[in-house]
Amino acid sequence: MTQISFADFFNETKKRGAARPVVQTAPAVQSEQVPSRLISIDTARKQFISLFNQTARHLHRWDVFSDFVRLAASELDIARVRTPENAENSRKICARYDADDIRNFHELFRLMVCALEAKFHDFIGSIFMELELGSGGMGQYFTPYSVQSMMARMLVSGIKETVTREGIATISDPACGSAGMIIAYAECLLEADINPSAHLFASCIDIDPVAADMAFIQLSLLGIAAEVVTGNTLTMQFNRVRYTPVYYLNDFEAKLNTQRRLKAMMDFMRDISKAA
């Protein structure tokens, strides 16, 4: 399955003129010499939380977390990563942090990648809840991944037949949070010997920009083709639409067009059969 490796994360941001350029030091390089697969999910989670709590202590935890996910999401958005707007937004965020904090962001990203490489799960959503960053006013509560896995298994019946018939399976989540439900569904495909990077397209919407960033990051790193929309499902007012790297790399636009034509043809044949 296709997973994206971003060992040089934030390098583009630094090259594009961050207020305080970060120079890679020996300790930062040494920290990446430990093979990622030697780090368990639980170890990655504990190290992530510990390091996060040491990063930019003068700033509110919510601000640091949202800045981290904004930077990560912007660097994974291959359609916009080199645009002047993206470069300026990244520069403004980086200007709030010193060199040590930026290095911590590097390490936080590495730990997140390690955890997601080990197993499909909602890593960043569980971190979000453990740090108690949810908004009660927005009813922001991310369902435990074990529950999402159980729900996904209820939806996956007949998935092999769908993929054989249409080439891809599609799933939609109108209030996706950190995309835990989508990830659980993709994991079910893996268990059925179906490559989600080639045969799954997800449509995700969330009203909270930070939640949408979290979803975009995890789906990008796990190699899941997805459309991630920031907006309100009820009012149909949408502010931003992004597609994960695998959407472009595996040409899902063509796959979706083929699926639509196939469905239209099947509907047409069904109507003719009924008329006869």
Give each language-model segment a name:
Residues 117-122, 185-191, 215-226, 259-276:
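Generic hydrophobic segment detector
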Residues 29, 105-109, 213-217:
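Charged/polar, low-hydrophobicity segments characteristic of intrinsically disordered regions
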Residues 2-17, 21-22, 26-193, 234, ...:
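Class I S-adenosyl-L-methionine
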Residues 145-247:
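Conserved S-adenosyl-L-methionine
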